[in-house]
Amino acid sequence: MKIFQAINAAHTAFMDTIKPVPPEPAPVIAPRPVAPVESLNWVQQQIDIDLLCMAFPNNNRVNLVQWVRPTQMACYRWGIDTIRELSSFLANINVETASLTRLEEGLNYSTEALIEKFGRHRISIADANKYGRKAGQKANQEVIANILYGGAWGAKNLGNTQPGDGWKFKGYGPKQLTGRANQTDFAVAIGKSVEEIPAYVRTPEGGMMSAGWFWKSHGLDAKAATPGVKDDRIAINGGTFG
């Protein structure tokens, strides 16, 4: 609930930082060195270092500079081109990645958290105790990933059909792109091999491209057009908890 309230607050605050779209196309004042301005619409042209600093307040200006061009280009390529959609897109990334500071899914769960978060239909109490974090025992994150994202559930929901797919295709990038199916579909969309994707989506360029692809391919552009962000969060991670 606190995360849901936080993202709503972030969404509202972020919307307040962007000026309304003018009735006529705004003239291009000066080309930005990070992208060809002529290829961006007015909303996409507002993506600069100042905007990213407001969108990702727990990161820093020096680190965020490298994300400006990738964000512009991803929004252009995938058609994220309205104020509401851009604000929702960035606000969701802010929550999903702790302000772009976490680009790889962590599975360092305690034994209790594994059952509480995923339920016994995804991991047994015995396996949670055996592989989860507890006093004197580190979490076995690779085994946890293969249990949570493997088996019949992983095959049906993530396309994880091979042994070890749960760990190999765990969440990476700003949208935590998870599963063989998602990463394969993204690879096809951008003309890369699926083997390249885990490393690629951890770069600013690949990360934002994957986030934009996920946003469009899962219909989040339509959900962003409705008030609030609940639908966005459910589509991204199955709930409003982060």
Predicted regions and their residues:
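Phosphate/ATP-binding catalytic cores across multiple sugar-kinase/actin-like superfamilies
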Residues: 217-218
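A short alpha-helix/helix-coil micro-patch that ends at or immediately precedes a cysteine
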Residues: 70-78, 95
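Soluble non-cytosolic domains of exported or imported proteins
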Residues: 4-5, 46, 58-66, 80-87, ...
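Extracytoplasmic/secreted envelope proteins and their assembly/folding machinery
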Residues: 4, 8, 49, 65-68, ...
